[in-house]
């Protein structure tokens, strides 16, 4: 009669077979991820094909080393060992490594991180900084021994010899390269005299360029206060650093050209052009001033200067005539008084009359002398005052005191009446004549 085994005995036997079977120690398996829900530590999911399903477990240490995100329905190639779980009698695969089936893990990681950063706005144009037209100092984050720095120095020196280049040496591939690149970019941003940064390296495989796809490098470029030009790999290579940079260059030479958009030759040409324009402008200004000078020489003020004081001469003649008439009237009054005295003296004794007459004559002479002196002094004072006023109105004296004589069509102007916007006026000053155009007319009481 056969012995019956217990369930646990059978399960232990099967587990022993599983553990000692060399074919189950390292299994290479292809399947589709199912029932995946990310957990804080260890990950539990299923792998299936169109006929079967196997449970899969991935410990947290192995899961953190994945270069991509596991997703529901993703077809993957995994490496692991098969074990049997005694309490349930079920078997599963303990996954140690995994990569997407058909494309590499780096490729899927690239697309996943690109999508994440794009959704976060890292690549938006609104965050892009403009490359300055004129730079004095360029920072370069790259390997000190590569061809990148040599190409940049050669190109910048050719295009604009005065620009200084400051190298910030860093690893560009291998373990720890991404962190060192990010730290070096942050260090360069502490330099206050830098105008922009070039970040890059030469060509290589996707593994060689991978440091420039790391999130820490993308964040360092995004946070840079300096404009950043990326130059990673060859023209056909594209990294996440290229997407986040303010400008992307296919080669180090192209990066140097982007960093110096204006060359020394451009500036010299610009200066020459400005010199020619200034020269032509000066010639036109000189010709205009010469034409105005000729017009001023033909002005009535220069051809007939006496017209400026004709009116004052007439006024002086009138004052002289008034003075003469006043003196004549005073003499006539004195004669009349003498006649009246003569009539009064006729009825008086001759001697007494003569005596009285003599006294009257003396008084009259005194009065006449006093009156004549007073009138003369008064008229002389008025004459001198008028003469001073006339002298003060001399055009040369007027303009010497800071005033100007204004004419419109050779006619003196003393009021805003009849003056309109756009009229051309001639303004005589102490040292020359101005041709002016009226821009505005405002009437004000002064």
Curated annotation (Swiss-Prot):
Reactions catalysed according to its record: Exonucleolytic cleavage in either 5'- to 3'- or 3'- to 5'-direction to yield nucleoside 5'-phosphates
GO molecular function, one term: exodeoxyribonuclease VII activity
Primary residence: cytoplasm
GO biological process: DNA catabolic process
A single cellular component GO annotation: cytoplasm
Record flagged with keyword Hydrolase: yes
EC number: 3.1.11.6
InterPro entries documented for this protein: Exonuc_VII_L (IPR003753), Exonuc_VII_lsu_C (IPR020579), OB-fold_nuc-bd_dom (IPR025824)
Pfam family, one: tRNA_anti_2
Subcellular location: Cytoplasm
Keywords: Cytoplasm, Exonuclease, Hydrolase, Nuclease
CDD domains (UniProt xref): ExoVII_LU_OBF
Enzyme class name: hydrolase
Family, similarity comment: Belongs to the XseA family.
Quaternary state and interactors: Heterooligomer composed of large and small subunits.
Record function comment: Bidirectionally degrades single-stranded DNA into large acid-insoluble oligonucleotides, which are then degraded further into small acid-soluble oligonucleotides.
NCBIfam families, per database record: xseA
Protein name according to UniProt: Exodeoxyribonuclease 7 large subunit
Source species of the chain: Streptococcus agalactiae serotype V (strain ATCC BAA-611 / 2603 V/R)
Lineage of the organism: Bacteria, Bacillati, Bacillota, Bacilli, Lactobacillales
């Amino acid at each position: 009669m056969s012995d019956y085994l217990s369930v646990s005995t059978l399960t232990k036997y099967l587990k022993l077979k599983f553990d000692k079977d060399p074919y189950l120690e390292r299994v290479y398996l292809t399947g589709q991820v199912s029932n995946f829900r990310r957990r804080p530590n260890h990950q539990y999911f299923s792998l299936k094909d169109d006929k079967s399903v196997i449970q899969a477990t991935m410990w947290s240490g192995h899961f953190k080393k994945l270069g991509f995100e596991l997703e529901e329905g993703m077809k993957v190639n995994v490496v692991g060992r098969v074990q049997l779980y005694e309490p349930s009698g079920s078997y599963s695969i303990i996954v140690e490594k995994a990569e997407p089936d058909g494309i590499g893990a780096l490729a899927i990681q690239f697309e996943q991180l690109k999508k994440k950063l794009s959704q976060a706005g890292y690549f938006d144009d609104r965050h892009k900084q403009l490359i300055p037209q004129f730079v004095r100092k360029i920072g370069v984050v790259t390997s000190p021994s590569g061809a990148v720095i040599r190409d940049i120095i050669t190109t910048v020196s050719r295009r604009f010899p005065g620009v200084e280049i400051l190298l910030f040496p860093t690893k560009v591939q291998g373990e720890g390269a991404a962190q060192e690149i990010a730290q070096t970019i942050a260090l360069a941003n502490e330099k206050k005299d830098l105008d922009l940064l070039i970040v890059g390296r030469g060509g290589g495989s996707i593994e060689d360029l991978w440091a420039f796809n790391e999130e820490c490098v993308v964040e360092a470029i995004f946070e840079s206060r300096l404009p950043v030009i990326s130059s990673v790999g060859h023209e056909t290579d594209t990294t996440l650093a290229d997407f986040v940079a303010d400008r992307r260059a296919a080669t180090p030479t192209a990066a140097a050209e982007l960093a110096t958009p204006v060359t020394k030759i451009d500036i010299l040409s610009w200066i020459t052009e400005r010199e020619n324009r200034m020269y032509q402008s000066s010639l036109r200004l000189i010709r205009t001033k010469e034409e105005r000078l000729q017009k001023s020489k033909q002005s009535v003020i220069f051809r007939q200067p006496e017209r400026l004081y004709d009116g004052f001469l007439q006024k002086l003649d009138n004052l002289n005539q008034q003075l003469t008439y006043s003196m004549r009237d005073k003499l006539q009054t004195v004669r009349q008084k003498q006649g009246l005295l003569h009539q009064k003296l006729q009825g008086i004794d001759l001697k007494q009359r003569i005596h009285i007459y003599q006294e009257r004559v003396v008084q009259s002479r005194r009065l006449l002398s006093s009156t004549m002196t007073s009138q003369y002094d008064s008229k002389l004072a008025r004459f001198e005052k008028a003469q001073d006023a006339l002298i003060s109105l001399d055009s040369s004296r007027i303009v010497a005191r800071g005033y100007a004589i204004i004419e419109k069509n050779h006619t003196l102007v003393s009021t805003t009446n009849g003056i309109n916007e756009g009229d051309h006026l001639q303004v005589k000053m102490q040292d020359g004549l101005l041709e002016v155009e009226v821009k505005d007319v405002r009437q004000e009481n002064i």
